[in-house]
Swiss-Prot record:
Endonuclease that is involved in the suppression of homologous recombination and thus may have a key role in the control of bacterial genetic diversity. HAMAP family: MutS2. Its EC number is 3.1.-.-, 3.6.4.-. Residues 707-782 form the Smr domain. It is an enzyme of class 3 (hydrolase). GO terms for biological process: mismatch repair; negative regulation of DNA recombination; rescue of stalled ribosome. Keywords: ATP-binding, DNA-binding, Endonuclease, Hydrolase, Nuclease, Nucleotide-binding, RNA-binding, rRNA-binding. Belongs to the DNA mismatch repair MutS family. MutS2 subfamily. It comes from Staphylococcus aureus (strain MSSA476). PANTHER family: OS10G0509000 PROTEIN (PTHR48466:SF2), OS10G0509000 PROTEIN-RELATED (PTHR48466). Homodimer. Binds to stalled ribosomes, contacting rRNA. CDD domains: ABC_MutS2. InterPro entries: DNA_mismatch_repair_MutS_C, DNA_mismatch_repair_MutS_core, DNA_mismatch_repair_MutS_sf, MSSS, MutS, MutS2, P-loop_NTPase, Smr_dom. This is Endonuclease MutS2.
Length: 782
């Protein structure tokens, strides 16, 4: 895409704002290289990449990338035999640390949110290499500034000797400086360092009283820095040890550099992936600042930008407009007052397309649609060249000639005030001829003009649409609202009336214009009113469609969760049934074994085929992974509303609330109300209640099978839960429902942790969608 176009559309300012959001020089480098792509697959992938990271960024706290830096130069130097210093090794260590933190974050993200997939980030995480050994080798050898003493046995020994020798030197020099006899001879009673040697400051007149080497003197010459002869040899020893230390440090750093060189390819991959992540996160941060949304890219030529606004203007004051090339429309001509926002509309369209093809979310409402353009050409603003002494018209025409040479059917062309700067009649004719030529090429065109002749241009040409920017005659100022499909109309009479011009003059002026022009203005005014009404209705329709899609997605997820839960329950029931049958079979085997032993010992009259028969009957009940429950329905009176029934498919008791028809009834099971087939219901005979059981049944009726904890404080909720569970156990309930609501999830977590430890609870689970979903926990009592 032409650099001139990007400059006119101020894309560099957008890049600068994205660059401000980067953390590392890796991310900054990628922002500086960011350019609009023109390949359809590349554009789509870049947008998916940014959108996926933006979703995660908007929902979760991402790991810090602080300290991430470009290390490829160090890696290449290590590969050719150079030796890295501690600072460079620490930057490599930080790269490994950052990538490991991101991998840990992603793994936790996947575990917590199993239903959501992030394929692009997943691919990047799979690319990240395992560099744990290299990290530990660097981390255990050096800190931010230097090698650890225990980096090697030799280094530890050398530094220990340096420390002990320094201590002896200090003790020796301390005795000298603290001696009463030397107090008047010293400039200061301290030990200092000159030329890496320990020295004492001696007044020049007492030089002869101290044997040793003079290493320095003060600016005035009154103080000499002398290394006493008593410590010269020890200082020499320190120098030798420092040399040995440097050699050992070089050896250790060479070894660490070798480890880096061995992992060079993996480190370069890690740098590339983490730099790309920094770049994408910067895009996500910027996108959130402009409330960017993801457009849908289409192979067919399409432009639909609902409520788009220019991202460099103040979002609080800028007017958002819907920009759309409707079906079969290739040219849009915008008319309206000067300073009414026509040029901003052109720049908004051009800049949003450049942003979208660079992988940036765009400042529009959800649902935008775009095609991919090979190039965007602009003739916007006054680009008059003083050096070339070109007029405004010549400057524009030079630019237009260049555009017409290169534009094709894959181009978007933006003309600002087409044909301006010359005689109006010639300018209008040129404008129409240029538009005809570009339409023949097949480019998509948006042009602004103030020529009234161009209002009629769309009426005798296919694929051309008028648009206008609105003017408020009450405030005598533009509203900056774009009206697609509505040509601009003259407001001269209304403005003159508002400013106080005599009605006689205005009415006479109206008689001087043709009837046709008057009717056209009235028609345009009617179009404006209808456009506003239709636009409001369409925005409301878009909102409702979006809400419906969201509800559909939520229901689909809940249905999938229900199916998974149902499947797990069935598998669990099968497993439990198999275990019971296995236990029964084993018990039967033991019984048969005992009977055989009894027959052998006692001579009991037990026939072998009878034993085998009984064993086979038990085996027939066992089904590997498929247990069928054959239920023989009891025949009682006809089921009516109010009857207590057993729901055969669920094995639960319930009460019939309503008979829907001959085949279906509505049944209440606990807190669940369901419509079920009558053939799935078995009428229960009412049992006579024994007097001795009255206490239990009375108690059972005093509490419900559900406990509502919504609105409770955490501690109060747990106290209430304990009391309720005690009563539920006394009432012989097998299952109860704890309603805690969704909220932040804190109360749900607390309730479930408490149930896990409670002595009366054997199991619990989250509620199914029909039971209240995530806002309910179902507890099974022992």
């Amino acid at each position: 895409m032409r650099q001139k176009t990007l400059d006119v559309l101020e894309f560099e300012k957008i890049k600068s704002l994205v660059a401000n959001e980067t953390i590392s020089d890796l991310g900054l480098e990628k922002v500086n290289q960011m350019m609009p792509a023109t390949n359809f697959e590349t554009v789509v992938f870049q947008m998916e990449e940014t959108d996926e990271i933006a979703q995660i960024y908007n929902k979760h706290r991402l790991p810090s990338l602080s300290g991430l830096s470009k290390v490829s130069a160090f890696i290449h130097r290590a590969d050719i035999g150079g030796v890295l210093n501690v600072s460079e090794l620490n930057l490599i260590k930080r790269l490994i640390q950052v990538q490991n933190q991101f991998k840990t974050f992603y793994n936790q993200l996947v575990e917590e949110d199993e239903g959501v997939k992030y394929p692009i980030l997943d691919d990047k995480m799979n690319q990240l290499p395992v560099l744990t050994d290299l990290f530990h080798q660097i981390n255990e050898t050096c800190d931010t500034y230097d090698l650890y003493d225990n980096a090697s046995y030799e280094l530890q020994g050398i530094r220990s000797k340096i420390s002990s020798t320094n201590q002896r030197i200090r003790q020796n020099l301390d005795r000298i400086v603290k001696s009463q006899a030397n107090q008047k001879k010293l400039s200061d009673a301290i030990v200092t360092v000159r030329n890496e040697r320990n020295v004492i400051p001696v007044k020049a007149e007492y030089r002869q009283d101290f044997n040793g080497i003079v290493h320095d003197q003060s600016a005035s010459g009154q103080t000499l820095y002398i290394e006493p002869s008593s410590v010269v040899e020890m200082n020499n020893q320190i120098s030798r040890l420092r040399h040995d230390e440097a050699i050992e440090k070089e050896r250790i750093l060479t070894q660490l550099t070798g480890y880096v060189a061995a992992d060079k390819d993996a480190l370069l991959v890690a740098e590339q992936v983490m730099g790309q992540l920094d770049f994408l996160i910067a895009k996500a941060r910027y996108s959130r600042s402009v409330k960017g949304t993801k457009p849908i890219f289409k192979e067919d030529r399409t432009v639909y930008l609902p409520k788009a606004y220019h991202p460099l203007l103040n979002r609080e004051t800028v007017v958002a407009n819907t920009i759309e090339f409707m079906e079969d429309i290739e040219t849009v001509i915008i008319t309206g007052p000067n300073t009414g926002g026509k040029t901003v509309t052109l720049k908004t369209l051009g800049l949003i397309i450049v942003m979208a093809q660079s992988g940036l979310l765009i400042p529009t409402l959800d649902g935008s649609q775009l095609s991919v353009f090979k190039n965007v050409y602009c003739d916007i603003g006054d680009e008059q060249s003083i050096e070339q002494s070109l007029s405004t018209f010549s400057s524009h025409m030079t630019n237009i000639v260049e555009i017409l040479k290169h534009a094709d059917k894959h181009s978007l062309v933006l003309f600002d005030e087409l044909g301006a700067g010359t005689d109006p009649s010639e300018g209008a004719a040129l404008a129409m001829s240029i538009l005809d030529h570009v339409r023949k090429i097949g480019s998509l065109v948006m042009a602004t003009t103030h020529y009234p002749e161009l209002k009629a241009y769309s009426y005798n040409r296919e694929g051309v649409m008028n648009a206008s920017v609105e003017f408020d005659v009450d405030t005598l100022s533009p509203t900056y609202k774009l009206l697609m499909g509505v040509p601009g109309r003259s407001n001269a009479f209304d403005i003159s009336k508002k400013l106080g011009l005599s009605l006689n003059i205005i009415n006479k002026a109206k008689t001087m214009i043709g009837t046709d022009e008057k009717e056209i203005n009235e028609m345009i005014e009617s179009l404006e009113r209808n456009y506003k009404r239709v636009e409001t209705q369409r925005l409301e329709l878009d909102r409702l469609v979006k809400e419906a899609e969201q509800v559909h997605d939520d229901l689909s997820k809940q249905y999938q969760q229900f199916q998974n839960y149902e499947k797990s329950l069935i598998e669990e029931a099968k497993e439990k049934a198999n275990q019971k049958i296995k236990a029964a079979t084993k018990e039967a085997d033991d019984i048969i074994k005992d009977l055989r032993q009894l027959r052998e010992q006692k001579g009991a009259d037990v026939k072998e085929h009878e034993l085998i028969d009984k064993k086979k009957r038990l085996d027939d009940h066992y089904e590997a992974k498929s247990i069928k429950q054959n239920v023989q329905k009891q025949k009682y009176d006809k089921i009516v509303a109010g009857d207590e029934v057993k729901v055969l498919s669920y094995g639960q008791k319930g009460e019939v609330l309503e008979i829907v028809n001959d085949e279906e009834a509505i049944v209440q099971m606990g807190i669940i109300k369901m419509k079920l087939p009558i053939e799935d219901l078995e009428k229960k005979q009412k049992e006579k209640v024994k007097p001795t059981k009255m206490v239990t049944r009375q108690n059972r009726q005093t509490i419900k099978t559900e406990l509502d904890l919504r609105g409770y404080r955490y501690e109060d909720a747990l106290i209430e839960l304990d009391q309720y569970l005690d009563q539920a156990v006394l009432s012989n309930y097998e299952q109860v429902y704890i309603i805690h609501g969704k909220g932040t999830g804190a109360l749900q977590k607390g309730v479930q942790q408490h149930l896990k430890k409670h002595k009366s609870v054997s199991d619990f689970r989250g509620g199914m969608p029909s039971e209240g979903g995530f806002g309910v926990t179902v507890a099974t009592l022992k």
